Amino acid sequence: MILTMKSSPILNRWPLAALALALTAGMSGAATTLYSLKTDGRDIPDNDSSGVASVLTLSTGGKLIGSLEVGLDIAGGWNSDYYAYLHHNRGVGSVMVVLLNRPGVSVEVPNGAESTGMGIILADTAPQDIHSGIPMNNGNVVAGRYQPDGRTVDPLSVTATSPRTTFLTDFNGATADGDWTLFIADQGGGEVGQLTSWSLNMTFVTVPEPSAALSVLLALGVGLGRRRR
């Protein structure tokens, strides 16, 4: 599998190092592949909605996504200030999934989570979404597995009760090939954070080997023949 880098217009002056690590699981030919991009601690401009974008360009030979998890590493800043999304052109229209939308912000707690930095995995199978489940007052780096925020409302008006309308399963069935764009912005004043790295952990749709498919068809044929007797 080939991993190439493409500079975004926002980061075209920053050299990025890309690392592709393939992990193969031997169950029925299924494979999970981790694509990781290290951004060398690029600043996320404080209180600036223009943010920064980082792009991974993948070439998998047309493989289709069966499931997707996203790793996100951010150093510093206030976690409740961050807004982030993942965008991909899936071949039949583009998909955008909101990963962060000012975690912890609610009507009761308008300033959101008082923690700095995170090293998390975002997965639809996690117990809680990051907005509602983030630790509120520990002041430490947040770690663990969370569902993506999914709230597409304006970051300046989002609350915990805003509807979640985007999920990582929205990418399922799409080709993995092409540009994957991570956008992140700091929507509040305070401290400058850095995007350290991010990753895509994909399981691809398994296509049966021709010999396996033939064996299944032969087995079905034998079964039908026995019924007719």
Where do the language-model regions lie?
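A short, hydrophobic C-terminal helix/tail in secreted or cell-surface proteins
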Residues: P208-R226
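Bacterial N-terminal signal peptides that target proteins for export
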Residues: T4-L16, R229
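Bacterial N-terminal signal peptides
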Residues: A17-G26, G221
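Sec-dependent signal peptide recognition
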Residues: N12-A18, S211-S215
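Protease-domain processing segments flanking chymotrypsin-fold serine proteases, especially trypsin-like
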Residues: M1-T4, S54
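Low-complexity intrinsically disordered segments
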Residues: M1-I2, L21, G29
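Loop and turn regions of beta-sandwich accessory domains that flank beta-strands and are enriched
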Residues: A31-T206
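Bacterial Sec-dependent signal peptides at the C-terminal "C-region" and cleavage site
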Residues: M27-A30, G225
